[in-house]
Amino acid sequence: MADIYRFPKFSYEDNGTVEPLPLRTGPDKKAIPHIRIVKVGDPPKHGVRYLDLLLLGFFETPKQTASLGSVSDLTEHTGYSICGSGSLPIGVAKYHGSDQELLKACTDLRITVRRTVRAGEMIVYMVDSIGAPLLPWSGRLRQGMIFNANKVALAPQCLPVDKDIRFRVVFVNGTSLGAITIAKIPKTLADLALPNSISVNLLVTLKTGIPTEQKGVLPVLDDQGEKKLNFMVHLGLIRRKVGKIYSVEYCKSKIERMRLIFSLGLIGGISFHVQVTGTLSKTFMSQLAWKRAVCFPLMDVNPHMNLVIWAASVEITDVDAVFQPAIPRDFRYYPNVVAKNIGRIRKL
């Protein structure tokens, strides 16, 4: 059984909403490109800004149609067939141009895609035709990029391995960063286990503008019967001296003194940002890698939910601090389905 502290609404009402991407089609029945920029922190209104970009679009393969014309018609591709949707995260860079120039440069990119496998399925992106507005990101674009297939493709099993695949950019998600950075809590600190400690986790409840059941993300009903989604992130540990008693009021007072502010960004799809504006103990600060602002991309926390809602409207409706006993050190973590060193199973 866990104890819960609900944060006041003002802690997330200013930047806790993301507007949807407008899904409109032109006369050719193709989606009209659109760029969506949200602000996290207090970025400058004009001039140079730091932008994190995520390119959204469709995976396509060339198709051939039966033709009764000349022989040359039989060898010419007349169009492309969509075989899936996905994204390409290209990271943060300093940018001083306009949003529309950036959108045009992104949609003009020629991106080829290959599905492969290492320890898990991967998507390989190779990029050409990098325009001037994208030069700040060119170092990463020119090198080629590899991502976990389940994080960047909605249905990687639909991408053929025996055909050429291109990625056509239609939408651009941008996060304009101010004082808040996109620092992440290192995995070693997030997995930290300390004796005599209480784990502080955040339960984030969202409302989205699309039905998600058919895509495998089941909502939960709140007290008013509304459908909501939620996910959890780990913030840190509260530790007291041996012999001291943990009380709910003590944990709540520690959290209240932090004066946390929450916001939504578009890093990796949908991202959850936490900023500490109050006092923070040295122990807790060290667990946040000495950062007062941290980012939790939903792409890492819950990849499938992220794939389903990354183009929809998303709104924070509640944020709860969940106080749970820290997992003991002697508990073993099993990341693999196959247990090691049991019976005939041996680690290679």
Curated annotation (Swiss-Prot):
It comes from the Viruses. The modification Phosphoserine is found at S70. GO terms for cellular component: host cell cytoplasm; host cell plasma membrane; membrane; virion component. A large portion is phosphorylated in the cytoplasm, but not in virion. However, this phosphorylation is not essential for virus replication. InterPro entries: Matrix_C, Matrix_N, Matrix_Paramyxo_C, Matrix_Paramyxo_N. A motif (YLDL motif) lies at residues 50-53. The keyword Membrane applies. It is a peripheral membrane protein. Plays a crucial role in virion assembly and budding. Forms a shell at the inner face of the plasma membrane and concentrates the HN and F glycoproteins. Acts as a negative regulator for transcription and replication by sticking to the nucleocapsid. This effect might be regulated by the cytoplasmic interaction with tubulin that dissociates the M protein from the nucleocapsid. Homomultimer. Binds to the cytoplasmic regions of F and HN proteins. Interacts with nucleocapsid. Interacts with human alpha-tubulin and beta-tubulin. Interacts with host ANP32B. Belongs to the morbillivirus/respirovirus/rubulavirus M protein family. This is Matrix protein. The gene is M.
